[in-house]
């Protein structure tokens, strides 16, 4: 989770939970880059002890086959694949997704174009990377996959033995099946263990590149636990581990590259580094030649249903909020998708969803307001107690508790109902910031993409965003309604500062998120003004016994 999200979660949570209690005490009611192909690969993680290494070699170093490309077109993407590394993807354009310049999103660039690399430790103890000398077993240079699956096989030789890599494409799926075929691997592969890796991570796809980078991550799943490595400036970090490996994945804000072995791998490695401020991840799965030697590459959107279909918890890469609240996040995401199937405008869906959440939380909201108003009505008596027992904290505490008990008030009564809402708050915040369906989804007028700020125009290069201002305004009105007319200068200053801070925090957030909070706040104002019972009058509190 990026720092901005974490900061927002903490601040919103603290304010929502404790603000009613604070207001009840202080506001008494007034009653009335370019990367060369790697020739020498870093030695991979070895599951068992290997013989002493003499050298690192890459097949085809001195006598590489000429580069040959094949174009593969499905109903979902346009792929250019080369014979390098036995089928490296050189470009991968998604028909359903465009970038900020209205070009198709391409998930391959120069930095990650040497992907799907096979490597192993030879029986001589050398690290062998199968970069070159691969040839396609088909003369066709174009493959159209519109009905049924189609396959493409590349072949190379090492020490007289044949190695093949077969790739299978499907018309309506982002899955690419990969099958590795070895001829007598025990003759040239140490301990019959090899690696399949993805190098170079994924490129940024969003206009706000720095924000996109905040979501970049690389993981491998071993025994149900995620293993990752955090990128550091000027340093390559690495994590490697033995164990049943279900998948390795590299993701951005909206897209993911994942390799899922048909049989669990026996180890994994994750590397990370910063390349010109870009977090770059490399992943590698170690597999045994005695397994099925089959993998599936998923390269496409961070779609929950697509990833869940693998049944290996790959969908955990979709941000649905904190792990403890994921079931709630799943329900919210499902509701939004189902509502969109009926009303094909996510802006309208967001508004209706805000209505539903407000309706669901109405009993808790009423209880919070009632508790806050009751505490505000008690504030004059509380102040008298503080003045009377200012030199005796214990008597002051006992007197306050007696007052609360006799009046039926609870100083924390407004906090608990708000605390119960936290799981929904956290889930909504996460989902609305990174839900793939919001990407490029228009609402109306100038709001043409719910995944980015609703910039109406720019003044001197500064974006003029409308929804954050509306959200901040409704928040300010709410606080004014909660505060007493005779609030002192410090209370008013705090209110202004808090609103300014939230306006600053939300100003660069996606318009879908700001639209939700604007509508939710607006409904809260209406509810507070017309639907909440009248506040407790000052004369209704039970006076403190002398």
Regions found by a protein language model. Name each.
Residues 1-41, 81, 178-181, 196-212, ...:
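Helix-loop-helix
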Residues 65, 100, 160-162, 431, ...:
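Preference for short coil/turn "hinge" residues that link or interrupt alpha-helices
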């Amino acid at each position: 989770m990026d720092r901005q999200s974490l900061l927002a979660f903490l601040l919103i949570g603290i304010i929502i939970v404790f603000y009613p209690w604070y207001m009840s005490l202080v506001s008494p009611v007034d009653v009335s880059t370019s990367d060369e192909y790697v020739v020498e690969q870093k030695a991979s993680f070895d599951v068992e002890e290997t013989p002493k290494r003499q050298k690192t070699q890459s097949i085809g170093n001195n006598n590489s086959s000429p580069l040959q490309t094949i174009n593969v077109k499905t109903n979902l993407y346009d792929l250019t694949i080369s014979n390098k590394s036995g089928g490296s993807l050189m470009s991968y354009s998604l028909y359903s997704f465009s970038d900020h310049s209205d070009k198709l999103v391409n998930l391959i660039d120069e930095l990650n174009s040497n992907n799907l690399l096979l490597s192993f430790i030879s029986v001589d103890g050398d690290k062998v990377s199968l970069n070159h000398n691969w040839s396609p077993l088909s003369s066709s240079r174009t493959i159209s996959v519109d009905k049924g699956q189609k396959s493409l096989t590349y072949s190379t030789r090492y020490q007289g033995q044949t190695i093949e890599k077969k790739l299978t494409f499907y018309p309506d799926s982002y899955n690419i099946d990969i099958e590795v075929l070895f001829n007598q691997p025990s003759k040239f592969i140490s301990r019959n263990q090899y690696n399949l890796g993805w190098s170079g991570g994924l490129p940024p796809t969003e206009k706000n590149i720095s924000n996109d980078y905040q979501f970049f991550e690389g993981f491998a799943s071993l025994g149900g636990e995620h293993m990752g490595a955090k990128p550091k400036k000027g340093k390559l970090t690495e994590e490697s581990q033995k164990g049943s490996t279900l998948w390795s994945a590299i993701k951005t804000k909206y897209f993911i590259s994942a390799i899922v072995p048909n049989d669990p791998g026996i180890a994994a490695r994750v590397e990370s580094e910063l390349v010109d401020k870009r977090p770059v991840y490399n992943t590698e799965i170690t597999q045994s030649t005695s397994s099925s030697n089959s993998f599936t590459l998923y390269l496409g959107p961070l779609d929950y249903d697509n990833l869940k279909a693998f049944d290996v918890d790959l969908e955990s890469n979709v941000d649905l909020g904190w792990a403890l609240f994921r079931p709630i996040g799943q329900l919210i995401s499902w509701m939004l998708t189902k509502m969109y199937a009926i009303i094909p405008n996510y802006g309208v869906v967001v508004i209706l969803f805000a209505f539903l959440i407000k309706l669901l939380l109405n009993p808790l909201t009423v209880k919070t307001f009632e508790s806050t108003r009751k505490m505000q009505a008690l504030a004059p008596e509380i102040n008298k107690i503080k003045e009377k027992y200012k030199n005796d904290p214990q008597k002051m505490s006992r007197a306050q508790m007696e007052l609360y008990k006799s009046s039926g008030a609870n100083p924390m009564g407004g906090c608990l109902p708000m605390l119960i809402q936290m799981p929904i708050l956290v889930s909504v915040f996460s989902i609305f910031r990174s839900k793939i369906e919001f990407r490029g989804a228009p609402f109306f007028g100038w709001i043409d993409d719910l995944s980015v700020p609703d910039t109406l125009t720019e003044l001197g290069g500064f974006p003029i965003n409308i929804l954050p201002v509306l959200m901040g305004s409704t928040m300010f009105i709410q606080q004014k309604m909660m505060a007493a007319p005779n609030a002192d200068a410090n209370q008013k200053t705090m209110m202004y500062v808090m609103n300014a801070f939230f306006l600053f925090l939300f100003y660069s957030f996606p318009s879908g998120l700001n639209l939700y909070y604007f509508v939710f706040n607006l409904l809260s104002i209406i509810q507070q003004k017309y639907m909440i019972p009248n506040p407790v009058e000052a004369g209704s509190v039970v006076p403190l016994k002398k």
